[in-house]
Amino acid sequence: MRALITGVAGFVGKYLANHLTEQNVEVFGTSRNNEAKLPNVEMISLDIMDSQRVKKVISDIKPDYIFHLAAKSSVKDSWLNKKGTFSTNVFGTLHVLDAVRDSNLDCRILTIGSSEEYGMILPEESPVSEENQLRPMSPYGVSKASVGMLARQYVKAYGMDIIHTRTFNHIGPGQSLGFVTQDFAKQIVDIEMEKQEPIIKVGNLEAVRDFTDVRDIVQAYWLLSQYGKTGDVYNVCSGIGTRIQDVLDLLLAMANVKIDTELNPLQLRPSEVPTLIGSNKRLKDSTGWKPRIPLEKSLFEILQSYRQA
């Protein structure tokens, strides 16, 4: 059994590669970084925007599964690079779908979307199901909603085997800065090491998000590749909402020093979804998946990853 992970050198890709290896899957991974190396992964240098190269890589490997992770993943950065976000996320996906179609492969594809596709959720719609109306409120959200629509179109028009996820906030050791848990943890450790004044700069702390550990996320991706229904969309989420303020409080309680907070207007986004909590009923019913790693454990391990760096 062969699996291709695009964007394998990214945060989720590394965890997914490790999980697939544990399932005795032969793993191939693409990365823009020629130097990237992962254990038990055959690495391939690839720019997802090079459609001809994408086609050659896929036709050469002939994977049974493709996990399409290569993407621009920052909501915040999407406001600064709207064109780049849309191009990479939408046209990169098109290149993968067309490569599989043109190669006439019998291959299951997982396209990775986001809770940001839902955007403005009304109070009575929470926790949000896959049937909910999409009202994305960021360029990133629009790009991922477009990916989901393309996936559905290729299933209907060409009979391709595609599943689309709407993945909510995922966290864990190794995620890049620019995501809230990492930014908080890095500042706390810098303060502990006296590299920073004992003040954490924060954005909107009232937003409510649905957090899941990345190790639970990749298990969901694997189970969906095995048991998901072609053409369906699946929320990948814990089903539990947590205020950003509460995430910060949990991290501050783990700090070795007293720390104050200060609002940084630069960390506020032009428009922000106030509450995003998902229903994972479809995922659970289809695969038997359930999250195993509690938020507190994820946050502690993120802190420890910076302390040990």
From Swiss-Prot:
It is an enzyme of class 1 (oxidoreductase). The keyword Oxidoreductase applies. Disulfide bonds: none annotated. Its EC number is 1.1.1.281. Keywords: NAD, NADP, Oxidoreductase. Substrate binds at residues 114-115, 169, 183, 209, 269-272. NADP(+) binds at residues 11-12, 32, 47-48, 71-73, 140. It catalyses: GDP-alpha-D-rhamnose + NAD(+) = GDP-4-dehydro-alpha-D-rhamnose + NADH + H(+); GDP-alpha-D-rhamnose + NADP(+) = GDP-4-dehydro-alpha-D-rhamnose + NADPH + H(+). It comes from the Bacteria. The keyword Transferase does not apply. InterPro entries: NAD(P)-bd_dom, NAD(P)-bd_dom_sf. Transmembrane segments: none annotated. Belongs to the NAD(P)-dependent epimerase/dehydratase family. GDP-6-deoxy-D-mannose reductase subfamily. Reductase that catalyzes the conversion of GDP-6-deoxy-D-mannose to GDP-4-dehydro-6-deoxy-D-mannose (GDP-D-rhamnose). This is GDP-6-deoxy-D-mannose reductase. It comes from Aneurinibacillus thermoaerophilus. The gene is rmd.
